[in-house]
Regions:
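Conserved beta-alpha
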Residues: 72-152, 156
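Short amphipathic alpha-helical segments
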Residues: 50-51, 77-78, 118-119, 173-176
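Short, well-ordered alpha-helical microsegments
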Residues: 22, 114-115, 169-174
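N-terminal nucleotide/polyanion-binding subdomain common to many enzyme families
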Residues: 1-85, 89-90
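Conserved small/polar residues in nucleotide/adenosyl-binding loops
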Residues: 194-197
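A contiguous pocket-lining binding segment that forms or flanks enzyme active sites
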Residues: 145-182
Length: 197
């Protein structure tokens, strides 16, 4: 995968738009397995600048998308006129709309939100393959519980795991599960699911 990026506060942010991003994920789904994608905004970019540990987490992603308007705006002002904002909820909808046979797994949010999301997605995207949905406990999982959760995700055959735990928790979770989860993990934020219901 050849990626064009713009360095913002020491973090490489992907120069892209929605169509390019969807194509990038679809065409490289096998290469992306076991990896993760961060959906960055000003808050997470500044946090990565100020916290070396969180910077490592962000920098280790397959790529960081410009969810925040100021990030794509900065890229445009610094030699990348094609840079556009790619938000988590919009990326989800764009991928759901494609009849590409990919299986989606949803990790995070409440049982109620997930049930409503499942209902809405079935109505709007009847072709969409939902491999599973889970609302993990708010507390940290034990090692055994975590292994069980990973086994459950992998057994589902999910291609894309949407991680909605909120920043920085979701990025740290994806970093810890790199090469353990078989699909590509995309951190979209806890509110992304509610945007879709």
């Amino acid at each position: 995968m050849e990626l064009k990026t713009c360095n913002i506060l020491g973090l490489d942010i992907l120069v892209t738009d929605m169509e390019k991003t969807v194509n990038l994920i679809e065409q490289n789904i096998e290469q992306l397995r076991g990896k993760y994608i961060c959906v960055g905004n000003v808050h997470t970019t500044v946090m990565a600048h100020d916290d070396p540990q969180y910077h490592t987490v962000q920098a280790d992603a397959a790529f960081v998308l410009p969810d925040g308007g100021p990030l794509s705006g900065y890229s445009r002002k610094h030699g990348f006129p094609e840079a556009e904002r790619v938000t988590g909820p919009d990326l989800m909808l764009a991928l759901f709309a494609r009849d590409n046979g990919l299986k989606h797994y949803f990790y995070g949010s409440s049982e109620e939100t997930l049930a409503l999301l499942k209902e809405k997605l079935a109505e709007k995207y009847p072709h969409l393959q939902i491999a599973g949905m889970v609302s993990p406990p708010f507390r940290e999982l034990s090692e055994a519980e975590d292994k069980e959760m990973v086994d459950q995700i992998n057994a589902s055959g999910a291609d894309i795991i949407w991680v909605g735990l909120g920043a920085p928790k979701q990025e740290k979770w994806m970093y810890a599960h790199k090469n353990h989860v078989n699909g590509v993990m995309i951190g979209v934020g806890a509110v992304s699911y509610t945007h879709l219901t």
